[in-house]
């Protein structure tokens, strides 16, 4: 905990310095799946530095106390991206994989500690059987394919969502990834698959109601803090910065409890066209906001 306090001390800058010019870059989208480059192993107990962006741009300098600690992202626009190019919708999802890994690298470079991404909502079951089957299998394969790369960079991986209807094979891959990365502390990434904000709140309410019926808790003593303990992951901090791509401007049932006081940044790029520089731009816009939390 002391390390985290020092990292975010006022006046300090948590950004990684510019990478050497010959340091590996990512992503090269000429092939799919996009190949993750071989990066030098970390030294002195440290994790490996992420590959730099292909542009070789470095993260902007933002004081530690102004960097959003928790960033949530609605990765929107995959289907439209594919349709605009005369491709099937699944091709857009495929291209989005590299973007997810790229913004993870960018989040590490700028000093973000928690990243939560919306990969499959409880409403997505309404899509065609073909697309749902693809998305479930795709999430499973992405976790299996990328967990070693993310582990090398000190990423802690976790699944957030509801178990009903969730494919057991997807849960299995997330369980393996979570066990592999449980001690990593560079950044925590929460992958929301079969997630819905209202469902999360209802499930928490059911648990509390049952505790009240069992006499374990008095209804009139239930607090926000007690309620939060029954969310899918009670240790997820409140969202500081909420990003949605593709130009749409709505929350779409994502992190309704955790994002109560988040700053929203809506960006026009479709998700497959997005990269870490867009994430950094959103962080710079966040710095300009005046967060009052109900105060005058």
UniProtKB/Swiss-Prot annotation:
Cofactor remark: Binds 2 magnesium ions per subunit.
Residue ranges with Basic residues bias: 1-11
Keywords: Magnesium, Metal-binding, Transferase
Annotated binding of substrate, by residue: 77-81, 89, 93, 121-123, 125, 127, 244, 250-252
MF GO annotations: ditrans,polycis-undecaprenyl-diphosphate synthase [(2E,6E)-farnesyl-diphosphate specific] activity; magnesium ion binding; manganese ion binding; Z-farnesyl diphosphate synthase activity
Binding site for Mg(2+): 76, 263
EC number: 2.5.1.-
Gene Ontology, cellular component aspect: cytosol; plasma membrane
Disordered: region residues: 1-29
Pfam families: Prenyltransf
CC cofactor: Mg(2+)
Family: Belongs to the UPP synthase family.
Role according to the record: Catalyzes the condensation of isopentenyl diphosphate (IPP) with allylic pyrophosphates generating different type of terpenoids.
Assembly information from the UniProt record: Homodimer.
Stated name of the protein: Isoprenyl transferase
Gene label: uppS
């Amino acid at each position: 905990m002391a390390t985290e306090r020092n990292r975010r001390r006022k006046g300090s800058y948590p950004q990684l310095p510019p990478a050497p010019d010959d340091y590996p870059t990512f992503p090269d989208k000429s092939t799919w799946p996009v190949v993750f480059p071989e990066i030098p192993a970390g030294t002195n107990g440290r994790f490996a530095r992420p590959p730099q962006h292909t542009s070789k741009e470095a993260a902007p300098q933002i004081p530690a106390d102004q960097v959003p600690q928790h960033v949530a992202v609605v990765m929107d626009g995959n289907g439209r991206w594919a349709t605009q190019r005369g491709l099937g919708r699944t091709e857009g999802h495929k291209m989005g994989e590299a973007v997810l890994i790229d913004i993870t690298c960018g989040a590490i470079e700028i000093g973000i500690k928690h990243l939560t991404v919306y990969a499959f909502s409880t409403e997505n079951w309404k899509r065609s059987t073909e697309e749902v089957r693809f998305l479930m299998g795709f999430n499973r394969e992405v976790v299996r394919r990328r967990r070693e790369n993310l582990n090398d960079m000190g990423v802690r991986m976790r699944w957030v969502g509801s178990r009903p209807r969730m494919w057991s094979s997807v849960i299995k891959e997330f369980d393996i990834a979570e066990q592999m990365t449980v001690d990593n502390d560079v950044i925590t990434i929460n992958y929301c698959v079969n997630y819905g904000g209202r469902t999360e709140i209802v499930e928490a309410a059911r648990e509390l109601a049952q505790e009240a019926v069992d006499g374990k808790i008095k209804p009139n003593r239930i607090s926000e803090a007690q309620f939060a303990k029954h969310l899918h992951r009670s240790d997820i901090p409140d969202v500081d910065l909420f990003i949605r791509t593709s130009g749409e401007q709505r929350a779409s049932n994502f992190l309704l409890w955790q994002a109560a006081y988040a700053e929203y940044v809506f960006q026009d790029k479709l998700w497959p066209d997005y990269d870490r520089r867009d994430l950094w731009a959103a962080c710079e816009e966040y710095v300009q906001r005046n967060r009052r939390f109900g105060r005058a």
